[in-house]
C-alpha cells in the first residue's frame, strides 16, 4: 500500500509534505508532486502537512494516481524532491479548482 497525491495538487504544488517524508519518496513535475509507490513506506506522516488535502491512502478509486506517478517518474523523468520550496505563484488561485489534471496536465502529454 502507498499514499498518492491527487488532483488537488495540480497547479498548486505546496511542498510542506516533502520536508516530513522520512524516505524522500516525493517527485516533482512542473505543476504537481507525486509519491513514488515503490519507495513510500505507508507511514502517512505527510498527510496532515498537505495544506490542501491532496494526499490520500491508496484505494481502488485512486489506483489511476498510482499508475500516473509511476509513469511520470519512469517515463517522463520527474526528479526526486527532498526539500520544501515555495508553492507555485498562483497556488492560492487554483487550490479550490476541481478536475485540474485533465485541464492542465493530461492535455500536455
Swiss-Prot record:
[4Fe-4S] cluster binds at residues 21, 40, 43, 46. Gene3D superfamilies: 3.30.70.20. It holds the Pfam family Fer4_4. Binds 1 [4Fe-4S] cluster. Keywords: 3Fe-4S, 4Fe-4S, Electron transport, Iron, Iron-sulfur, Metal-binding, Repeat, Transport. Coiled coil: none annotated. The keyword ATP-binding does not apply. Its cofactor is [4Fe-4S] cluster; [3Fe-4S] cluster. GO terms for molecular function: 3 iron, 4 sulfur cluster binding; 4 iron, 4 sulfur cluster binding; electron transfer activity; metal ion binding. Residues 2-30, 31-60 form the 4Fe-4S ferredoxin-type domain. [3Fe-4S] cluster binds at residues 9, 17, 50. Disulfide bonds: none annotated. SUPFAM superfamilies: 4Fe-4S ferredoxins. InterPro entries: 4Fe4S_Fe-S-bd (IPR017896), 4Fe4S_Fe_S_CS (IPR017900), 7Fe_ferredoxin (IPR000813), Fd_C (IPR022569), FdxA (IPR054829), RnfB_subfamily (IPR050294). Ferredoxins are iron-sulfur proteins that transfer electrons in a wide variety of metabolic reactions. PANTHER family: FERREDOXIN (PTHR42859:SF2), OXIDOREDUCTASE (PTHR42859). This is Ferredoxin.
Amino acid at each position: 500500500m502507498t499514499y498518492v497525491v491527487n488532483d488537488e495538487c495540480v497547479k498548486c504544488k505546496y511542498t510542506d509534505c516533502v520536508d516530513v517524508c522520512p524516505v524522500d519518496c516525493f517527485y516533482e513535475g512542473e505543476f504537481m508532486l507525486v509519491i513514488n509507490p515503490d519507495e513510500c513506506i505507508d507511514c502517512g506522516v505527510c498527510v496532515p502537512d498537505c495544506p490542501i488535502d491532496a494526499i490520500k491512502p491508496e484505494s481502488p478509486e485512486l489506483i489511476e494516481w498510482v499508475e500516473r506517478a509511476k509513469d511520470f517518474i519512469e517515463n517522463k523523468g520527474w526528479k526526486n524532491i527532498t526539500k520544501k520550496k515555495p508553492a507555485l505563484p498562483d497556488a492560492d488561485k487554483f487550490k479550490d479548482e476541481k478536475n485540474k489534471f485533465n485541464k492542465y496536465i493530461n492535455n500536455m502529454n
